[in-house]
Amino acid sequence: MQSVGQQILIRTKGRSLWWLSKCGWNICCTVIFHFVIYLSTIIFCLLTQSKILSSVDVELMNVMFTTNRATQVSEIGILPFSLLLLPIAISIGINLFQMTLSLFIKPIFSFLFISLFMLSSAYYMSPFWIGNYAMPIRYNLMHTNGMLISNGIIVSILLITASIIIGLISFRYYDIINRD
């Protein structure tokens, strides 16, 4: 923790409040970043006069992803919800986990670990690699043996909660003076 962080910690009059405010800041930044991405997409669609739809064209999905999911049209309604919120929830969970991991190892190693973990999600489809839940092409609606959206929601909630609680407990005993 650098001098600015130490000064803010002293002014907040408590480690728990400081950790929770840092988690809140992390969550707000993640939501804002995703909002900017979504807003950029909408602006691009408006500039190129592309249609912005809140539904999924099942025929196009079958052609693009070589699936045969025309019989599951009722399940497709959850896809737009998942496209918007599940990647945000997974990002929040990963960001909070990286921040918590930085309490135990140096931040650069925490970043490297999370980067390799997320990179592995691009190459291996498994519920263990939680980055798969942030990729709609890996959902069970698109892929025969794909990820369940409900599992992604549960995993993201558990990761967010565990990261906040473990970080809160660990930061109480964290030596802020003798660390890099």
Segments predicted by a language model, with ranges:
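Helix-loop-helix units of permease transmembrane domains in multi-pass membrane transporters
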Residues: 1-28
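Transmembrane alpha-helix boundary/anchor motif
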Residues: 35, 39, 96, 129, ...
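Juxtamembrane "helix-exit" motif on the non-cytosolic side of transmembrane helices
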Residues: 125-143
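Transmembrane alpha-helices and adjacent helix-loop boundaries
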Residues: 1, 30-34, 108
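Central hydrophobic cores of alpha-helical transmembrane segments
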Residues: 106-122
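Junction motif at the cytosolic side of a transmembrane helix
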Residues: 160-180
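Secretory targeting signals
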Residues: 20-103, 138-157
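Membrane-interface helix-boundary motifs at transmembrane edges
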Residues: 99-107, 172-177
